[in-house]
Amino acid sequence: MAFSKDKTSRYSEHVDAYRAACGHHPDLKSFDSKIQQRTSNLIDSLTVEAKTGSVSPHAVHKEVIDIHLVEVSKAVADVITECGEEVWENGTLQSLVKDYFNSTMETLKIFETVTQCVHEAKRGQRYIKAAVAQFKKDSEEKDVGVKKKRYGKTLEELMKFKAMGNPFDDGLLKTQFELMNKQQESLFDRVTETKERIAKEIEEVQKRISNVNTATIVSHVVFGAAAFGYAAGCIALMCTGVGAPLGAGMVTLLPVIVVQWVGVNYVLNNSLEALQKQLKALNKVKPIPERITEGMEADKEGMKSVPEQVDELKDQISSLLQTVDDAIGSEGDEVDVKLDMESLEDDVKTLTTKITEVCETVAKYSKIIKEARLHVLEKITGTG
């Protein structure tokens, strides 16, 4: 029974693939050498035994096919079973990224609250400046009169500042800062866990790829063993002079094994492709936790600087309110009012500086955090 042209062509391709694999894999090359030697020895043995009539086709089948080929096929099957999982989907990483974006959004919300408080502080700053300007006008007046108080208009402006109060005094920012710190600590722990998990996933996938590569070698071993079995069987038939029906049965054995070998290789190649795709995906997402860490560092730095400056601004406004109270309380004493207003004139300069510092810091770290968010998004989408 001859092979069809199509089968012959495919068989030749597989033989070429087997030979190429032997050239690339030392272990497979060593196996092939042993197979070649074993084939040679078996041919010699069968030739001698044929002359004495002590060999049978059944023994050839048992020696070459049943025992050796089944054992090798079992090893291949074990590896295929080990590697037959679906492509990895990292729900943990997706959750981590979502938490990171939520965290940075909360930070930006806090900065927005700070900005709103600063706007209120600027309004208070204008009241103080107006009071200082009015104080200078009032100081220039002469002969105020008994019914008119010299610094009446000045005190009216100060009352506006007092009515406004301290925009940083409601405790909202303090609560937000404390919650933000806890959230960042929790997120940092999750980032660390995810980095370790991804590293472990990569290590496991690499091991499985190594196993599949080994299985690929084994599949070539199977093919080599099949070819060996076919050659040995045909030689045995010729040596024993068994009739045509049995010879024909042996001839049809190789195409079946070749087809089985093709099936094994098809599964192995699919498994290897899936694992390589999984490894590629893991390596792609591996930098993401590190990028999130970078973003958190920017977050942390901002959350460290802003509260400090906010506290300083809050203290400055509290000090101004106390001085305003003193000035209002000294309503009947022009000398005391004058001293308090001169102090406020110096303090409002410090207030202006503090407001500017907070505004610049919030703007700077808001920009940094937004850029960090963008970099993470670019890494996730593969555009960065």
From Swiss-Prot:
Location(s) in or outside the cell: Membrane
Topology with respect to the bilayer: Multi-pass membrane protein
Alphabetic keyword roster: Coiled coil, Membrane, Transmembrane, Transmembrane helix
Coiled coil regions, renumbered to chain: 184-215, 264-361
Membrane-traversing stretches: 217-237, 242-262
UniProt keyword Coiled coil present: yes
GO cellular component, one term: membrane
Family the UniProt entry places it in: Belongs to the UPF0496 family.
Name of the protein this chain belongs to: UPF0496 protein At3g28310/At3g28320
